[in-house]
Amino acid sequence: MQTSPSSTAPCADKALDDLLKEVDRRRNFAIISHPDAGKTTLTEKLLLYGGAIQEAGAVKARRSQRSATSDWMAMEQQRGISITSTVLQFDYRGKILNLLDTPGHQDFSEDTYRTLAAADNAVMLIDAAKGLETQTRKLFEVCRLRHLPIFTFINKLDRPSLTPLELMDEIEQELGMNTYAVNYPIGTGDRFRGVYNRLTKTIHLFERTGTHGSKKAADQTMALDDPALESLLGSDVYAEFQDELELIEEAGAEFDLAAVHGGEMTPVFFGSAMNNFGVELFLQAFLQYAAKPEAHDSNRGTIEPTYEEFSGFVFKLQANMDPKHRDRIAFLRVCSGKFEKDMVVKHPRTGKTVRLSRPQKLFAQERESVDIAYAGDVIGLNNPGAFTIGDTVHTGEKIIYPPIPSFSPELFAYLRSTDPSQYKNFKKGVSELQEEGAVQILQSLDESKRDPILAAVGQLQFEVVQYRLQEEYGVETRLEPLGFSLARWVVEGWDALEKAGRLFNTVVVKDRWDAPVLLFKNQWNLEQVAGDCLDLKLSAIAIPPSL
């Protein structure tokens, strides 16, 4: 692999020094979790401790004063779930953190997949009562593909739960990575009193304030050998804590930051996001151990974040974030150099130059103009059809970053307009929603069937498409479900396609790039086809064509 082209374009000393300092300040991460693990609550509490909000939005939302900070779409507010992604930037102790807030509902994981393409770190949030769940496992596999450092926050320790040792063992056995409990809990459920920081050798006892977590939690810090500790905890809790601590100190792995950054070890933190227990300690440790903005592979080799020429890629599109203006925003991850307002960049996919004249920082529904940004930052670009997901923009010599893959959907249905006179609006709406990545669109190989096939990872995704077509394009639609549950893209073995389509109740369709896709009724059908058509190589991931 080539080295970074930075040596061919030397910076002035001060400019390079400033660039190095700004990149060093950035930390970028996404939270992955199963629904109801507490992602929105943890997000808000991180913002609370980061000083971005003064009171936790979830608490105020329950009082019907406003919605949670990170939710904005009308349907989200009606349903009480996160459907879209946004970016939340805040300063903490001299660092700039970019939290790539992602949908928490299981029906919107593909948007999360794309967001993980822009993340340098992942925070895996686990419900202490439930352990690892389906959605978390799926998202973990995407993190593993990208070798992302994963920090684990085990939530809801103030409720009945599995034991800390059971939870860590499950992570090790099912995900195949070592764990290191940085903050080990003292008691669980109604006996949850605090945590012991194994790296700083300090005890942190939490005080219940009665504010339901809307304000920062107070804690009492003391040494592990403080003679007052046993009386404060009670003899039973103290003895149980000492026994478990002795066990993990003797049998557990040593903390290895290189293994963390390689995705081979996950630092584990315990707490209660609702009551703010352990949140600030987690944030402090994350700041210390998280990976800085990473280098990215490109057509020219590895591009370091400190390369002087600006570059970045679009990982998300979102229309109508402000319904009054029917706008369209492209979310761009800065990969190298310094972004400046009004700069002119090259757009390799179209061969054109584009002036980035109205860049925005996106804090949920709020926006403010951005004058400069650096690697690890995410900015919003007004996008009148100029960009699509995976686009690269850059200054200097041509840079193209790898395209963002699509993942296998699990639900399929024909989408039909109920009013033929609205077909033009219907077609426009479907096209724009596809460009956003709101849903995958497949087409039948039968030219007489012009209606698109929606391919989604959950039923609610269909509902969102229908809702937005009606609200934003004035088109009413109906769905005709198809009885398939798996999709696989054909990598090799084209000659076997006809046979696979004729046998085993399997259908061949095409994606937006006209690549063949096989739809299967179930896993059993997939295994039958794979066993019978040995020359047929299939993939659960689709890589868009390169430029």
From Swiss-Prot:
Gene3D superfamilies: P-loop containing nucleotide triphosphate hydrolases (3.40.50.300), Peptide chain release factor 3, domain III (3.30.70.3280), Translation factors (2.40.30.10). Transmembrane segments: none annotated. One of its GO terms (cellular component) is cytosol. GTP binds at residues 33-40, 101-105, 155-158. InterPro entries: EF-G-like_DII, EFG_III/V, G_TR_CS, P-loop_NTPase, PrfC, RF3_C, RF3_dom_3_sf, RF3_GTP-bd. Increases the formation of ribosomal termination complexes and stimulates activities of RF-1 and RF-2. It binds guanine nucleotides and has strong preference for UGA stop codons. It may interact directly with the ribosome. The stimulation of RF-1 and RF-2 is significantly reduced by GTP and GDP, but not by GMP. CDD domains: RF3, RF3_II. One of its GO terms (molecular function) is GTPase activity. One of its GO terms (biological process) is translational termination. It comes from Synechocystis sp. (strain ATCC 27184 / PCC 6803 / Kazusa). It is found in: Cytoplasm. The keyword Transit peptide does not apply. Keywords: Cytoplasm, GTP-binding, Nucleotide-binding, Protein biosynthesis. Pfam families: EF-G_D2, GTP_EFTU, RF3_C. Residues 24-294 form the tr-type G domain. Belongs to the TRAFAC class translation factor GTPase superfamily. Classic translation factor GTPase family. PrfC subfamily. This is Peptide chain release factor 3.
